[in-house]
């Protein structure tokens, strides 16, 4: 049986999924395929490296630093989040908390990181084999929130956040041969996602990136469709949705350590359902 896990991201709400992954590492639970979208890309790569607690540190310590995100970055780099600081300065071999690149590559599990081509609006699925030591550009590209960040270039091609191209890539997991898939959401699964500021941000990138802007305008509908599809698969016993019943007040860019810690522990507790699911028990729909 081939198992997969999909982390849809969600900015700093991703600490919920970080709790799920730490539970899995504590219980020696591993997946044959890991797919990360946006902040989910950081979660899956640290999980493949076996670095328990690494994501927790990034969310609860580094994300609070002005170097990580803030108005100063917006003025200096035209991006609110400094992706080079997150996935370079902190994560490179000489950084404060280096990614164990060798462990990632030695892990037999497959990995896909989703980014969105800013020129075409299409999803690109970067594979683990495209990762190289101290060059974690796929994670930067996957996390480049439109308007909040400039698109990130990989091989001279600009990319935006993966959630524009494929917000809930559960179908991709099945297309890759998975039999059972854990879908990590960082919003309550029983609440449809609202439009938020998507239209506002889409208007800001429309002139230069019209296809990406169109994908941004339809992202909410496609996210809700992806969750509905995941629920259908859950009723069939092929998917387990792990999601918080409450986000503890944490939003995409919330800088509240106490709230993030609560959400992390909620994720850790909710992950207990994964053991039974992978053992063949059907998830409650």
What are the functions of these language-model segments?
Residues 1-37, 45-285:
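Patatin-like phospholipase
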């Amino acid at each position: 049986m081939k198992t997969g896990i999909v982390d849809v991201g969600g900015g700093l709400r991703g600490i919920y999924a970080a709790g799920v992954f730490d539970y899995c590492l504590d219980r020696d639970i591993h997946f044959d395929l890991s797919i990360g979208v946006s902040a989910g890309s950081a979660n899956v790569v640290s999980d493949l490296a076996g670095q328990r607690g690494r994501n927790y540190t990034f969310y609860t310590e580094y994300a609070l630093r002005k170097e990580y995100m803030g108005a100063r970055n917006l003025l200096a780099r035209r991006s609110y989040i400094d992706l080079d600081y997150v996935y370079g300065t902190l994560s490179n071999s000489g950084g404060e908390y280096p990614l164990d690149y060798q462990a990632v590559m030695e892990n037999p599990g497959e990995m896909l990181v989703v980014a969105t081509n800013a020129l075409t609006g299409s999803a690109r699925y970067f594979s683990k084999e495209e990762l190289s030591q101290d060059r974690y550009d796929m994670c930067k590209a996957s996390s480049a929130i439109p308007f909040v960040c400039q698109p990130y270039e990989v091989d001279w091609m600009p990319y935006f956040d993966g959630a524009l191209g494929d917000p809930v890539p559960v179908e991709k997991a099945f297309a890759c041969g998975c039999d059972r898939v854990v879908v990590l959401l960082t919003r309550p699964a029983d609440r449809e996602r609202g439009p938020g500021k998507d239209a506002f941000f889409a208007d800001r990138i429309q002139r230069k990136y019209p296809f990406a802007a169109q994908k941004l305008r339809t992202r909410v509908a496609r996210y809700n469709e992806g969750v509905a599809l995941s629920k259908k698969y859950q009723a069939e016993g092929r998917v387990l949705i792990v999601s918080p019943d409450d986000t503890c007040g944490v939003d995409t860019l919330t800088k509240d350590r106490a709230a993030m810690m609560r959400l992390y522990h909620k994720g850790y507790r909710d992950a207990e359902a994964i053991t039974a699911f992978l053992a063949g028990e059907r998830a409650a729909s």
